[in-house]
């Protein structure tokens, strides 16, 4: 059954306006979600332009088909139900060799967080799931109940940056020996019980970072983003642009590093000119990340941690 998507798009105008949209261009929304970015991008295209929209969540596609109906009727939209790590292969299958621009809105969409049964939220009691793609096999239940102590510590440190990772992993190990940990609230309580009392008084939910780390592991979010962004930069036409919105430091560091590698080059000393194969492919459109306005911060709480980075293709 299709559930309504109630999703406030973050950095809507900045993300699309920075793509410098050509009316007859070929564009990609790598993270369809609530379709806010797609809708605004389509409003800038002529009927000769086309948008390819990726999402691995069928619920997002079903809702977008309603929201974008006027553009679908004109043949301006193609939906691709897949992980964006397969971006290049799926676009090539569709006959696309080059794109004029692409946008990413990384992280979990509000509707996924709000659907209790998806198991993303520590605030709502639900089975441990956290799959963005409901057809995927690995769930949060598997991670929490079957990963060994060392693997749990690794993902809690690496993806959650939680300094109490060892204590939390040990507590999970103890609890699951008694009985399986089955729900989000069970896990949240175990995490709380593993932390010192003074930590529980700090701002923010004590389970937030651990839930984030499990979600990233279940969906291989950073691995997928790394592969996809590199493919996107390869597929950009000259002067094409890429916009990436991130919501936590791990995503932002990854995006910053990928853009840096593509926009800088180490040239051997003494070369009178830079050979074509050494020239950087990209240039940064803005040196620093673009942040939400004061108005947006007030209107949309989700936007507080958002950062937008944009780069442009300057060399094939």
From Swiss-Prot:
Catalytic activity, as annotated: cytidine(1402) in 16S rRNA + S-adenosyl-L-methionine = N(4)-methylcytidine(1402) in 16S rRNA + S-adenosyl-L-homocysteine + H(+)
Q: Which SUPFAM superfamilies match?
A: Putative methyltransferase TM0872, insert domain, S-adenosyl-L-methionine-dependent methyltransferases
Q: Which domain of life is it from?
A: Bacteria
Q: Which GO terms describe its molecular function?
A: rRNA (cytosine-N4-)-methyltransferase activity
Residues binding S-adenosyl-L-methionine? 35-37, 55, 84, 105, 112
Q: Where in the cell is it found?
A: Cytoplasm
Coiled coil ranges (UniProt) are none
NCBIfam families with a match to the protein in the record: 16S rRNA (cytosine(1402)-N(4))-methyltransferase RsmH
Q: What is this protein's function per UniProt? A: Specifically methylates the N4 position of cytidine in position 1402 (C1402) of 16S rRNA.
Q: What is the official name of this protein in its record? A: Ribosomal RNA small subunit methyltransferase H
Q: Where does this protein come from, organism-wise?
A: Streptococcus pneumoniae (strain Hungary19A-6)
């Amino acid at each position: 059954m299709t559930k309504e998507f109630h999703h406030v798009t973050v950095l809507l105008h900045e993300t699309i306006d920075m793509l410098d949209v050509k009316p007859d261009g070929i564009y990609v929304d790598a993270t369809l979600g609530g379709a806010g970015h797609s809708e605004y991008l389509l409003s800038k295209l002529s009927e000769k332009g086309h948008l390819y929209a990726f999402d691995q969540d069928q619920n997002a596609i079903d809702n977008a088909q309603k929201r974008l109906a006027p553009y679908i009727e004109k043949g301006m939209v193609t939906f691709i139900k897949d992980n964006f790590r397969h971006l290049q292969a799926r676009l090539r299958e569709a006959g696309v060799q080059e794109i004029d621009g692409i946008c990413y809105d990384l992280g979990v969409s509000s509707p996924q967080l709000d659907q209790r049964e998806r198991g993303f939220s520590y605030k709502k009691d639900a089975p441990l799931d956290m799959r963005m793609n409901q057809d995927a096999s690995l769930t949060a239940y598997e991670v929490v109940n079957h990963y060994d102590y060392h693997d749990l510590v690794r993902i809690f440190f690496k993806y959650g940056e939680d300094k109490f990772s060892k204590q939390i992993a040990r507590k999970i190990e103890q609890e699951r020996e008694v009985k399986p940990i089955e729900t989000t609230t069970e896990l949240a309580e175990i995490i709380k019980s593993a932390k010192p009392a003074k930590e529980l008084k700090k701002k923010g939910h004590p389970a937030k970072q651990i839930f984030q780390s499990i979600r990233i592991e279940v969906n291989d979010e950073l691995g997928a983003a790394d592969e996809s962004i590199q493919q996107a930069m390869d597929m950009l036409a000259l002067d094409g642009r890429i916009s990436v919105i991130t919501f936590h430091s791990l995503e932002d560091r990854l995006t910053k590093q990928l853009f840096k590698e593509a926009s800088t080059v180490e040239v051997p000393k003494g070369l009178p000119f830079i050979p074509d194969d050494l020239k950087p492919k990209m240039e940064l459109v803005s040196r620093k990340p673009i942040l939400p306005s004061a108005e947006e911060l007030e209107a949309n709480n989700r936007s507080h941690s958002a950062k937008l980075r944009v780069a442009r293709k300057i060399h094939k």
